[in-house]
Structure formats: structure tokens, C-alpha cells
Swiss-Prot record:
Coiled coil: none
Residue numbers spanned by region Linker: 242-262
Complex and partners: Homotrimer.
Residues holding UDP-N-acetyl-alpha-D-glucosamine: 13-16, 27, 84, 89-90, 152, 167, 182, 239, 343, 361, 376, 387
Chain sites annotated for binding acetyl-CoA: 390, 396-397, 415, 433, 450
Annotated family: In the N-terminal section; belongs to the N-acetylglucosamine-1-phosphate uridyltransferase family.
Main function: Catalyzes the last two sequential reactions in the de novo biosynthetic pathway for UDP-N-acetylglucosamine (UDP-GlcNAc). The C-terminal domain catalyzes the transfer of acetyl group from acetyl coenzyme A to glucosamine-1-phosphate (GlcN-1-P) to produce N-acetylglucosamine-1-phosphate (GlcNAc-1-P), which is converted into UDP-GlcNAc by the transfer of uridine 5-monophosphate (from uridine 5-triphosphate), a reaction catalyzed by the N-terminal domain.
Biological process annotations from GO: cell morphogenesis; cell wall organization; lipid A biosynthetic process; peptidoglycan biosynthetic process; regulation of cell shape; UDP-N-acetylglucosamine biosynthetic process
PROSITE patterns in the record: HEXAPEP_TRANSFERASES
Protein name as annotated: Bifunctional protein GlmU
Length: 473
């Protein structure tokens, strides 16, 4: 009869700030393939058989907790948080989690929240190693790497038994030459872990409570079972934007391989010129091209297939798929696209909307103004809060010269209107649908210039009969 695996709880360490990310967002909430990295770690723990997951939060705890609740809230108490009030080391972080662990859990799986490539199969192997380890109170993953800089080194005795871990900053020159390292994945028996955490001290180079020190205690209490990881890449932690990008490429590769095997062709790329500047927390999606002196502000999003040349995009703006823009500016919180075309000298101010199949040229669209569908807006000034309906055309060219159109704040331009420049439409004015405007419209006035509708009863029947007879001849 097969032995039942040990019931376990996972503890995920996610309290760190991640200063090398240079971001206001907590490190573990940075996304890969559309999901925060932390969610991949939680998924791996659950897939490896954890009955519940305790995530230790600290920096940005409200944001992290909210993100977890949104993603895993439907699972009730299966995923919950524990607060680490001060960053006093990984050992202290696990201490903070202990009161939140169910008393029925016999083992505790400890993971880092910045390792989104974790393979659940490797975690399952670790679980099996602890079950086979007899009296050993802990099992851990180790990895052989070519450059161990920054990692804790695995210390073994003459017989090859693991006797401890030495953090890089505390290691001697001889110990730093060791290439077997600690990737930070442990599975410890609950009773042992509680006692070991109580025995931790801050007698080290960083003055912190090192979780790694529990391995030396385990070696004296029955041994530490070590499983050498076959896939070292899956254990890599994310500390900066370059590592985030590399990990995302791995994840995209996994997704692409799966889809390609099902018959899908996938091509992904982004091209960014050397002169382009992009601020923290901006998102540049696939197949985006950023050229020249383009600037993208903090938190802005440039979506799939967009091409921007010498464009300033302010903080929080959204450029939706397949937008083309050049020598223009997009204000904070503005929304552009999809399928918009901003030609040179377009100025889209804060919170304005330029929608699908709208073209602008030498036009100012002031704060909160909207042109959401099918319009040409050339040589114009559209006032704050004005609305330009679908099918509106600024008739700005007489064959020899360009002329300007001015629309006042809060004005409403009905669909399928033609504005023959030069012309001014006053603040709060209303242009009826289908109107051709050739003269100035005063403030709060209604301009209507369409032909009066006439209904001829029975005419359609007679017309169709006549056309049918003509077709027979």
C-alpha cells in the first residue's frame, strides 16, 4: 500500500521591497505574461499539494493582500496573509507566518515570492524526499551553478552530508568557491521548524535572522535531505527589470511551445530605439515600435502593434492596440485607440479620448474632450469636455490653403457633421446630426442644416415594381 504524502502548508515570503526594481509597486506584483509573479509561486505550491498557503507580506501589504484576494479569494482561507511588521530577515518572516498555520499541517513548504518559474514537479520530488528521509526534519533543493555570486553556499562534510548553509556575505574565500548553492526552497517538519526558528540569532554580517541557519540545526537533529535540482533555471529569483524580462521570455516560451504544438503560429517582438526613454511602471506590449525621441511616462501602457515616433506619452495614459502616432503628445490619463492615427502636432490633453479610426493633425484636443469613432480632425482646437460624434469631418483644405476649426468647451458635434473651416463653434453649442457648418455658431446655440424629412406613403412599393419591370427589358 502506497504511503500517503505528508500533509503540508506552504509559506511564501513576499514582504520585501525589491529596491532594485526601482518601482513604487511591490516587487512580487510585477507581472509576467499578464499575472503578478507572486501568483505563479502560489499556484506552484498548490499544484505541489499544499492544503493552504500563507503569504508573508510587508512592503505594500495592502496592495499585495488585495491582489491575492482578487486572484484566490474564491478559495476562501486556502490562501491567506501574515504580516511581517519589520524586515528582520527571512527567519523572522517565517516566524511571523507560524501563528497562521493550521495545527494539522505536518510539514511546511517554504518558498520565495519572487521565483515565478518554479516547477511544481520539483516541489513534489522534495515532498517525496522528506517522506523517505526517516528522522531528517528537513528537505531542501540545491543547485549547481557556474556563477554562485550572491547565493548561500551549501556546506557538506567529508561524507557528503549537508551540514549547513553559509550566506555569501558571511562566507570565507574557500566557501565562496563552492558552486552548489541554496535557491531558497525548503520543506520542514512543523515541530522541528518551530523549535529551530526559536533558536535563530542575529550573529551574522547583516544582523538579521537567517532562515538558512535552520539547516545546521537540522543536520544535528537527524540530517538535512538535499535534492539537487535538475532545472536550475526554474529556481531563479527576480531582483531587477532585466531578470523580470528574462523570466517573462521563459514563460512566453512555455506558452508559445504549448500553442505551437496545437498548430498556432506565434511571433512576438518589440523594438525600442536607443533614444527612447520609458519611466518606471510603464508597460510596453508585444510588437510595439518606439522610435526616435519618444518618451513614455510612469504607469503608461502602450498596447500591441502600436508605432510611436517622437511622441510624448504622459503618466497613466493608455495607447490601445495598433495606434500610429508621430511628433505628438498624449496627456496624463488620456486614452488613444485602438486604430487611431495621430499625425504631427497633435496635442491630446489629460483624460481626453481619441477612439477607433480617428485621425488628428495639427489639432489640440483639450482636457476631457472626446472623439471616439470615425473622424478626421485636422487643424483644429477642441475645447475642454467637448464631444465630437462619429463621422465628423473638419474640412480644413480648400485646395490651396489650410484653415482652422475652433470648438468651444462643452460643445456637442452630432454624428456625420461636416465643419467647413475657417469656423468657430461656441462653448456649449449643439450641432445637429448630419449638419454642414459653414458659419460660426454662437455659444449655447443649435446649428442644424440638413434637408427636412418627407415620407411618401406607398412610394417604395411603386418604385420597386418600376425597377423590377425595367430589369426585365
Amino acid at each position: 500500500m502506497a504511503t500517503q504524502p505528508t500533509p503540508l502548508t506552504a509559506v511564501v515570503l513576499a514582504a520585501g521591497q525589491g529596491t532594485r526594481m526601482k518601482s513604487a509597486r511591490p516587487k512580487v506584483l510585477h507581472e509576467l505574461c499578464g499575472r503578478p509573479m507572486l501568483h505563479y509561486v502560489v499556484d506552484a505550491a498548490l499544484a505541489a499539494g499544499a492544503s493552504d498557503v500563507v503569504v508573508v507580506v510587508g512592503h505594500g501589504r495592502d496592495e499585495v493582500s488585495a491582489a491575492l484576494d482578487k486572484a484566490f479569494g474564491a478559495q476562501g482561507k486556502k490562501v491567506r496573509t501574515a504580516l511581517q511588521p519589520q524586515q528582520r530577515g527571512t527567519g523572522d518572516a517565517v516566524r511571523c507566518a507560524m501563528p497562521h498555520i493550521d495545527a494539522t499541517s505536518e510539514a511546511i513548504l517554504i518558498l520565495c515570492g519572487d521565483t515565478p518559474l518554479l516547477d511544481p514537479e520539483q516541489l513534489t520530488q522534495l515532498r517525496g524526499a522528506l517522506d523517505r528521509a526517516g528522522d531528517a526534519p528537513i528537505a531542501m533543493l540545491t543547485a549547481e551553478v557556474s556563477d554562485p555570486t550572491g547565493y548561500g553556499r551549501i556546506l557538506r562534510d567529508a561524507s557528503g552530508r549537508v551540514i549547513g548553509i553559509r550566506e555569501h556575505k558571511d562566507a570565507t574565500a574557500e566557501e565562496r568557491a563552492i558552486t552548489e548553492v541554496n535557491p531558497g526552497v525548503y520543506l520542514a517538519r512543523s515541530g522541528f521548524l518551530g523549535r529551530a526558528l526559536a533558536g535563530l540569532t542575529t550573529d551574522n554580517a547583516q544582523g538579521e535572522l537567517y532562515l538558512t541557519d535552520i539547516v545546521a540545526q537540522a543536520a544535528k537533529a537527524g540530517g538535512a535531505a538535499a535534492v539537487v535540482a535538475r532545472d536550475v533555471g526554474s529556481l531563479v529569483g527576480i531582483n531587477d527589470r532585466a531578470q523580470l524580462a528574462a523570466a517573462e521570455e521563459v514563460l512566453y516560451g512555455r506558452i508559445a511551445d504549448r500553442l505551437r504544438k496545437s498548430g498556432v503560429t506565434i511571433r512576438t517582438s518589440a523594438r525600442i530605439d536607443a533614444g527612447v526613454l520609458v519611466e518606471p511602471d510603464a508597460v510596453i506590449e508585444h510588437a510595439v515600435v518606439l522610435r526616435g525621441r519618444t518618451r513614455v511616462g510612469a504607469g503608461a501602457r502602450i498596447d500591441v502593434g502600436s508605432v510611436l515616433t517622437d511622441v510624448v506619452v504622459e503618466a497613466g495614459a493608455s495607447v490601445k492596440p495598433y495606434t500610429v502616432a508621430s511628433q505628438s503628445s498624449i496627456g496624463a490619463g488620456a486614452q488613444i485607440g485602438p486604430f487611431s492615427h495621430l499625425r504631427p502636432e497633435s496635442q491630446i490633453e489629460a483624460d481626453a479620448h481619441i477612439g477607433n479610426f480617428v485621425e488628428t493633425k495639427k489639432t489640440v484636443v483639450r482636457k476631457g474632450a472626446k472623439a471616439n469613432h470615425l473622424a478626421y480632425l485636422g487643424d483644429g482646437d477642441i475645447g475642454e469636455g467637448a464631444n465630437v460624434g462619429a463621422g465628423t469631418i473638419f474640412c480644413n483644405y480648400d485646395g490651396f490653403r489650410k484653415h482652422r476649426t475652433e470648438i468651444g468647451a462643452g460643445a456637442f458635434i452630432g454624428s456625420d457633421s461636416q465643419i467647413v473651416a475657417p469656423v468657430k463653434i461656441g462653448a456649449g453649442a449643439y450641432v445637429a446630426t448630419g449638419t454642414t457648418v459653414t458659419r460660426d455658431v454662437p455659444d449655447e446655440a443649435l446649428a442644424i442644416g440638413r434637408v427636412k424629412q418627407e415620407n411618401k406613403e406607398g412610394y417604395a412599393t411603386r418604385l420597386k415594381a418600376r425597377l423590377k419591370d425595367a430589369a426585365k427589358k
